[in-house]
Amino acid sequence: VRKLRITLFLLLGLSSKLFSQEAVESRLRKSEIEQVFLAHNLSLMAQRFHIQQADAAVLQAKLWPNPTISISEVNLWKNSSSESFPALIGHYGKYQQLAVELEQTIEMAGKRKKRVQLQLLEKENARLQFEELLRNLKYDLRSQCLELQILQEKEQLYSSQVDIFQTLAKSFQNQWKEGNVSEMDYLRIESESIAFGNKLNEIQQEKIAKMNAVASYLGDKGAALYISDTIGMPLFLLGTKQEWKMMALESRSDYKIIHNNWKKSNAQLEIEKAERTPDLKVSMNYDRGGNIMRDFIGLGVAMDLPLFNRNQGNIKVAQLELEKNKVEIAQFRIDIEREIEFLSARLSNLESSLKTMDTGFDRKLDVALERYVRNFQERRLTIVEFIDFINNYMENKESILERRAKYLQYKEELTYLIGKDIV
């Protein structure tokens, strides 16, 4: 029995050591994973191009319309009524008629400046869209990392139980063959060993899938990794829900996008109002042989007369869009405040539950496990009593882990709802 106990604890220590060594090569803290994510995530790289495209659109909006040149009244032959003119080039052009016109459109009512202002708001929108994508991806990545941490800790938990029961099963098999224990006792231990092994395999399969999910956020640096941070007793949040609501309204990129959309609608309305004023077209033309003057140079202006179309329909559309944006802002604010209200209640409830828990209970369970294993090896406990304790031990360990992880998940949700990291 004493040899069995020594062997069991050596295996437990060796298992823990091997587990640690296996993970050393790819150990990363969550903060390090985020740094890799920020530098190598392809979705973020692609979104940055939208900001550069918006810069190019601002440049385009600043440009004047090109002048128009037209050449007309060019005769390819002469008839009997043709008059003779001085040659254009050498002896060519004595009977050549020609008209050339150069026209430039001048936009009135500050249309060009108003379009530039709209494109600047589009650029701001592209920047906010990048921030919103970053906010969503960071939340997704952190959630995936937390789930991976849970699976890692469950793997350690079940791995230790597998080691215990495999050692016990081997010992009971030998003792059963020698007639020292019943076959039923041996089979009970063996079945528990198989059950824990199956559960461990399920957890490991889930962990591999979750590692792949985390790696997918890291671009070309995505690989199998082990998160070195552990899930201990979480630090409880400071601040009130009213403070969180104010922070969210100041920081949320999607809320800023809604506000920016209102500004864009206002800028579009100004453009539509400016369209009521017709543009001015200034022209200069040269006419050779087509007028009473042999070489005629003249100036001209042209503009539409706003008698029927004063852009009334488009102005109305822009006004309605502006009103719609106001309603969307109000609704978005209500949604943000409601989400924080409910999440705050869940956080408060779970925080109270965690505070009532004995801070040393986790360690006491581990000490109790060692004691129960030793007592069982020394035949002071029955199999039923031992397995009943093991089941209670696992249930409590998983419950503690899940409650702590749930609080951390709620903290990540609050960070997501506020739009910035909180202590």
Annotate each predicted stretch with a short phrase.
Residues 35-45, 52-67, 92, 100-117, ...:
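A glycine-/polar-enriched beta->alpha junction
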Residues 46-58, 133, 137-156, 174, ...:
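Amphipathic alpha-helical coiled-coil segments
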